[in-house]
UniProtKB/Swiss-Prot annotation:
This is Cytochrome b6-f complex subunit 4. InterPro entries: Cyt_b/b6_C, Cyt_b/b6_C_sf, Cyt_b6/f_cplx_suIV, Cytochrome_b_C_euk/bac. It comes from the Eukaryota. The gene is petD. GO terms for cellular component: chloroplast thylakoid membrane. Keywords: Chloroplast, Electron transport, Membrane, Photosynthesis, Plastid, Thylakoid, Transmembrane, Transmembrane helix, Transport. CDD domains: cytochrome_b_C. Component of the cytochrome b6-f complex, which mediates electron transfer between photosystem II (PSII) and photosystem I (PSI), cyclic electron flow around PSI, and state transitions.
Amino acid sequence: MGVTKKPDLNDPVLRAKLAKGMGHNYYGEPAWPNDLLYIFPVVILGTIACNVGLAVLEPSMIGEPADPFATPLEILPEWYFFPVFQILRTVPNKLLGVLLMVSVPVGLLTVPFLENVNKFQNPFRRPVATTVFLIGTAVALWLGIGATLPIDKSLTLGLF
């Protein structure tokens, strides 16, 4: 159904790209009409059908009514704020806690500049950026799990 362009292996530009490992995605099916008319509507309708099916089969119930006079002992944020909450909870100085929170996105912005991204997009060929990502993920998981524990066990997760 799609129109494919056959590669000309006698083309010196294509040979140079293939020698550098950059020509693998140069030829292929065009996005119009193959993807935009046939594949995308199926994916969109499938996503809508899954959402409607989940809403019908498992509706979310409304919880208990809020009581303003009964405050819980420890209020926890939503799960995606657990690492930041753990940083604020363990650092004694508020200014240092805010600076640590600001340093997280600043550090994430520097990751693409650690190695030459234009040369390779394969993560196995960029070991420094991959290592920074894996260590950052491990630290975020460690802080997130620690935020759910009491303060005396939060940094060691009760393991040591």
